Regions:
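C-terminal end segment of the histidine kinase catalytic
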Residues: 162, 167-184
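Two-component histidine phosphotransfer core
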Residues: 1-155, 165-167
Length: 184
């Protein structure tokens, strides 16, 4: 990212200025997430970080990366660094290696007892053996964060050559609101 920023400063100063702002927002969110009490924050904060991260990659990938957001203007407590790493995986491991690039979509749905975030990419996909070989520290960290948050889970399905879908479910009740109020 810093190398790309350095190159943009000379070639496209306006784009470099925007990328520096996106990078600063992304770093601020990441650092704040590490120090957050209980690791609980707001959905809006997480989506701001996702957008900053996607915009940085948009500068690098250009037309090869398309982002689609179906996100209503709502906010609720979530464990931090759960959506952003999923989007990061979609871009790095799904879209970047695909000839011609692809699309990453984020959709939020409100259901009676939980919120559901679906991250879908039409990238290269992966098989179970790829996860076993490479390990998946990032996904394991997301699962661990979500396990501490009552009523939350992560489900991932992927097909080689077709893409990947991650469904993150966040419970609405009890412990979640208490954790958020403790962290503010």
């Amino acid at each position: 990212t810093l190398n790309a920023l350095q190159a943009l400063i000379v070639l496209k100063p306006e784009a470099a200025y925007k990328m520096a702002g996106d990078f600063a927002r992304y770093l601020r969110f990441t650092l704040d997430s590490v120090t957050a009490d209980g690791g609980i924050g707001s959905f809006r904060e997480e989506i701001r970080a996702v957008r900053a991260y996607a915009d940085i990659n948009q500068q690098q990938l250009g037309d090869r990366l398309h982002m689609v957001y179906e996100i209503p203007d709502v906010d609720f407590p979530i464990p931090l660094l759960t959506i952003q790493p999923i989007v990061e995986n979609a871009i790095l491991h799904g879209i970047k290696p695909k000839v011609g690039g692809g699309t990453v979509s984020l959709k939020l749905e409100e259901l009676p007892d939980h919120w559901q975030v679906t991250v879908t990419d039409d990238g290269v996909g992966f098989g179970l053996e790829a996860v076993r070989e490479k390990g998946s520290i990032g996904l394991e960290n997301v699962r661990r964060r979500m396990a501490r948050f009552s009523g939350s889970e992560l489900r991932i399905t992927s097909t080689v050559g077709v893409g990947t879908q991650a469904v993150l479910t966040y419970g609405k009740q009890g412990k979640n609101m208490e954790n958020l109020s403790k962290s503010t």
